Amino acid sequence: MANYLVNNLSRPLKIPIRIKYCDSFFSKLIGLMGHSEISENEGIALAQKTEDRIGSSIHMLFMRFDILAIWLNSHFIVVDLKIAKRWNPFYIPCVPARYVLEVHTSQKPHFFIGDKLIFEDI
């Protein structure tokens, strides 16, 4: 898995979020399930081959903590975001998405629909 720093070009973050990029079936299925928590500036990005609603849905089964789910289109524009509660079965974005960022809930004030994000190599 590759690592990236994610920043918001529309509202730059003081500290970019360090993410692990998950594009295999297994890495996306497991996601953050085995973690007891994540720090405020860490998360994962789940990548799909194309934009769609069902393929970019997430489940929260076996999760020990809530997350902020941020759905992005192919141009890294935020198209939806929700606080995903642990143990809720699943969340589906309102519109098709290609990427899902799963980050700490404290990041919610820093992201809005329409924001443009950037993934920078570490």
Where are these regions (language model features)?
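Compact, glycine-rich, soluble single-domain proteins
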Residues: 1-122
